[in-house]
Amino acid sequence: MALLTVDKLSKTYQATSKKAVKDISFAVDHGDIVAFLGPNGAGKTTTLKMILNLVSPDHGKVYFEGKETTNDNLLLLKNTGVLLEGSRNMFWSLSPLENFIYWGGQRGLSKAKAERSGLLLMKKFGLLDKKDTTITSLSRGMQQIVGICCAMIAQPKLLILDEPTLGLDLKSAQIVTNILQELSANGVGILITTHQLDFAQKVAQKILLINHGKLVFSDNVKESLARSNKQTLLELTLTRSLTLEEQEEISTYCNLTKKQMNCYQLEVKSQKALPQVFNLLGKLPVRQIQTKERNLEDVFEYYTEEG
């Protein structure tokens, strides 16, 4: 049984008649780290808010370990740690320690246990000396770390983290990565949103990609990239732009994408076509040509490009 099941969620905002989310379905299992990606305005935040009962769906249901959560906020509250929109799950006039005690109490922890759990997390991030400082006095990155600690305070079965590495330096982002991987190994299900695709590729086992309210891609990260990399991908830099005639000729053998001025990406449709491709490229004013391995950014661009 999946830890979290999202079944055909849909939402239209009446003020704009915009269908923000259209029949979204997915699952997060115990130990999964799932990255929920998409451009700004694609429907990620609306989906998260429906999962957390902050917005009511027009259709669809959410289940936690097989139990419907629509009318049971307590079930989610006890079992889910949440970081939404940066560090907004905190009281800004309080210290990190006071926030830990409050949020731990909301999830059934004693004051002593909440304090102990929070301080242990802050120690991992090297911020133990900031435990009594007000949140407003902390840097943006430190505030983000405290927000993450608040989400983790009661050792939840499920973590929902919105942009967990936003504003963090490389060292802190790596600590977040290590902690998420450790939690995953211990059976915690984790759903993250992020615009940092390198972080998503590093930490997530599964990718969900939403665009215009629809789920357009769902797959295992490593398996998907391994399949994609069986086809040759070339990055071509010229001294000028391709003419329309040249583009049409290359497109016979390749999926052609213009990356920037005079720079193109060529996905060779068949390995048998490589001789013809290189014959065509030999006639062009090539500045540089190199083979390239696909990464998550290529997948993201493919499924979200307009037109």
What are these regions (language model features)?
Residues 101, 105, 113-130:
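Conserved ABC ATPase "signature" region
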Residues 159-163:
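Catalytic Walker B motif of ABC-type/P-loop ATPase nucleotide-binding domains
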Residues 60-71, 75-76:
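Conserved ABC transporter NBD signature motif
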Residues 269-307:
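C-terminal coupling/interaction segments
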Residues 1-6, 10-23, 73:
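A short, flexible loop at the N-terminus of ABC-type nucleotide-binding domains that lies
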Residues 177-265:
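ABC transporter nucleotide-binding domain
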